[in-house]
Regions:
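Active-site/binding-pocket entry motifs
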Residues: 1, 89, 155-157
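Bimodal feature
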Residues: 12, 19, 23, 52, ...
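Noncatalytic linker/hinge segments flanking ATPase motor cores
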Residues: 32-40, 120-127, 155-160
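Long, domain-scale regions corresponding to catalytic signaling modules most often appended to membrane systems
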Residues: 151-186
Length: 187
């Protein structure tokens, strides 16, 4: 994970993080996302539509994959993304609420270099995109229960999780959350 990279080679990790952040900022601008909060290695962002959030996430993961393949250092940062659409409350310069919490749980559920989305996002993007999805069924993470899907960036990412099983997944990393909430997590 991110902490292990920092312990091993702080300078290379910061350099890699900055390069990934540049990619994220470029894509946030392209897809009209706005950052509402950052905490350590997390980012909370809002998007004007589910399609924008998902396309931003897919482009981000693809660009990070290309970057990691061409990078000569040992520091290959990987990310988990969770995208939800739900109610949030704006508190000062931050977004809080159940919509954010579920996006965080989706981020924790996502595979390394993967994207997990809620059913509400899935229902919006399926008719408007040509992406492939894997139905994970109803998942329970901490106190949240929700229907989740993986976006398959690569067919080898397909996995099966027990439905209605309690997952004890650490909330690793970053968040690109939105009203459409997309969470990006560092590994």
């Amino acid at each position: 994970g991110y902490s292990k990279h920092m312990e091993k080679d702080e300078n290379a990790t910061i350099k890699s993080y900055n390069a990934c952040e540049k990619i994220l900022n470029k894509l946030l601008k392209k897809y009209k996302g706005s950052v509402f909060n950052t905490a350590g290695d997390s980012v909370l962002a809002e998007f004007p539509s589910a399609v924008n959030a998902v396309e931003c996430g897919v482009d981000f993961q693809n660009e990070i994959k290309k970057r990691n393949e061409s990078d000569k250092t040992d520091v290959k940062l990987e990310f988990r993304l969770g995208i939800n659409m739900g109610d949030v409350v704006k508190k000062e310069d931050n977004l809080i609420g159940d919509g954010v919490n579920i996006a965080a749980r989706l981020e924790a559920l996502a595979q390394p270099n993967g994207i997990s989305i809620s059913k509400s996002v899935y229902d919006f993007v399926v008719p408007k995109t040509k992406m492939t999805f894997n139905d994970l069924g109803v998942q329970k993470v901490k106190q949240n229960e929700f229907h989740a899907f993986d976006i398959l960036l690569d067919p080898s990412q397909k996995r099966k999780l027990n439905t209605k099983s309690k997952l004890n997944l650490p909330a690793i990393g970053a968040i690109v959350s939105a009203v459409l909430l997309g969470m990006i997590g560092f590994l």
